[in-house]
């Protein structure tokens, strides 16, 4: 049975993948909690290398030397990128990577400096303010603009129990400003990469097209397409994986 490892985004937990996994009965699906999240809430990391080492340990424990695919959403996708293309560690039998709404990296020092200031400000808020207050503002960001008021409130309610100093620390450890620009490495990699993106997620649609990645558009969905259209998302995962294992 083919193994699929799922990585959630900032503020999420492994349970975010439940609906997707239910639609993939013919695969061995393993969703992991990232550091500072869920059952790994007390596990501290300070950078991408630490995060990739944690990921390598979890994968080794889950699949031994068996073949596996990585699926990562947003922050989880960025950690998957670092693990697959940069980390100084053994990746054993990684067969391919599916990214969902994950930024490949910033190109200029100016962009990185601006992003660090932005992430630092958010991190301070996560560390100092009430979860409800900071999450209400977090979900007002342009990437979530397609959400209705009710959907925003549901997300705030869902995320507030996992929200606090831990999220601020993770934001600083894995700020996009600290991530290498992987756009060229993804294009040149012999490892298959696929990019999943909701049709309403215009920012990441543009990013995927600019970087000439193999784009899979998820209809009726925005940034969090695996949550908003789980069934279609699962079907496309299956299609991508079968392309590789049964060419």
From Swiss-Prot:
Q: What is its EC number?
A: 4.2.99.20
- What molecular function terms (GO) are annotated for this protein? 2-succinyl-6-hydroxy-2,4-cyclohexadiene-1-carboxylate synthase activity
Q: Give start and end of each AB hydrolase-1 domain.
A: 4-229
UniProt entry tagged with the keyword Oxidoreductase? no
The alphabetized list of GO BP terms reads: menaquinone biosynthetic process
Known catalytic reactions: 5-enolpyruvoyl-6-hydroxy-2-succinyl-cyclohex-3-ene-1-carboxylate = (1R,6R)-6-hydroxy-2-succinyl-cyclohexa-2,4-diene-1-carboxylate + pyruvate
Question: What superkingdom does the record give?
Answer: Bacteria
Record keywords: Lyase, Menaquinone biosynthesis
The protein's annotated pathway: Quinol/quinone metabolism; 1,4-dihydroxy-2-naphthoate biosynthesis; 1,4-dihydroxy-2-naphthoate from chorismate: step 3/7; Quinol/quinone metabolism; menaquinone biosynthesis
Tell me yes or no: is Heme among this UniProt entry's keywords.
no
Please give the InterPro entries that the UniProt record associates with this protein.
AB_hydrolase_1 (IPR000073), AB_hydrolase_fold (IPR029058), SHCHC_synthase_MenH (IPR022485)
List the Gene3D superfamilies. alpha/beta hydrolase (3.40.50.1820)
UniProt subunit comment:
Monomer.
Quote the function comment for this protein: Catalyzes a proton abstraction reaction that results in 2,5-elimination of pyruvate from 2-succinyl-5-enolpyruvyl-6-hydroxy-3-cyclohexene-1-carboxylate (SEPHCHC) and the formation of 2-succinyl-6-hydroxy-2,4-cyclohexadiene-1-carboxylate (SHCHC).
Q: Which family does the record claim for this protein?
A: Belongs to the AB hydrolase superfamily. MenH family.
Matching HAMAP family: MenH
According to UniProt, the name of this protein is Putative 2-succinyl-6-hydroxy-2,4-cyclohexadiene-1-carboxylate synthase
Natural source organism: Haemophilus influenzae (strain ATCC 51907 / DSM 11121 / KW20 / Rd)
